[in-house]
Amino acid sequence: MIYDVIVIGAGPAGGMTARILSKKGYSVLIIDKKKKVGCPIQCGEVISEFGLMNSKLKPRKEWIKRKHKGIKIFVPDDNFFFSFTKSYSINREKFDQWLIKEAVDYGGRLLLKTNASGIRKKKIWYVKTNRGVFKSDILVGADGPEANVAVWLNLLRKKEFVGAIQYKFKSIDFPEKEFLCMFLNAKFKNGYAWIFPRGDEFNVGVGGIGNIKKWLDDFCKSKGFDLNKKISVNAGIIPKNYILKNFVKQSALIVGDAAGLTNPIFKGGIYAALFSGKLAGETICKAFEFNDFSLLKEYADKLRNSPFCNPILKKASEIFYSFKNEELNFTGYVYSQNNWKKVSYFEIFLKFLSKPKFFLKLRDLWTVKNGIELSEKTI
């Protein structure tokens, strides 16, 4: 059998792509090397309300854990400021499974424990796996940070990532229940620590480049959390700087983490996965409708023009994560216990006047402010 589309990867990006295509009646094969969709969990399990709404998905009780008012961002001296980006903590395992079930219910086929080991293109795509060779007209690489499909297509020029590790606690004594909490410190190179309240449980984690396991253990101890009471551990990698020659080659498309679309400031990737998966699915439908696969390049064009590929994000991230603790504390002083959006440029300027040694960082803080604003539409 020759499928219309083979999707490699059953995460949010692959699930969304497959859901759209199978709903339109196209034959879709989804393959994933995992034994179970959504396992193991490799993220903080958060998506913004905007991201979910813009993906045309309604919150469902089966995978929503808690709604949050926003993000409370702590600097090393314990000062903090807010980003009032409403968001949801989700059960990522159930969310991924729901998306894939939707695709299968519409007619898609799912094969788990199926590891793609290579691809070949003649008139159609041949995907080599441990369960045989599968064929399709169009191929979608939704294989996460490993990005094997992009590598096989010779599209991936650069691949840098950060590590992340997270403990789940059934219940911890932590006063903040309404906000996601993000803890900045220069020792978390290219990352941060987090505490995400989820109703009857909490996710506590650290991401960055370095000894993240030690950082997380030390962080938990500093907050008084009993490590013996953690109920699960998950870890993974998060794209930091993936540079692709293109997001499309011939009749193959790269989506989600495999395309390096993760937000470089907050490290969130679920909305980026859904956005790119939705865009890929819609573009593929159009290509089939007009019997013109050259239209697939529209996916790359639209993705490049989306907020996810805006160079401000990368620039702001590089500046943000180059700050020393003194500069992070000054950032906390500038926005002190306020919604960062409501602090005017004049107020920021006055803060700089009060501490003139930071004047050389004025432009940097402006860039970070712009990056955070853009991030609120990409997480």
Segments (PLM) and residue ranges:
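Beta1/beta-strand and adjacent pyrophosphate-binding region of the FAD-binding site
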Residues: 1-11
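Short beta-strand to alpha-helix junction loop
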Residues: 82-102, 208-215
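C-terminal helical "tail/cap" subdomain of flavin- and related membrane-associated enzymes
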Residues: 285-379
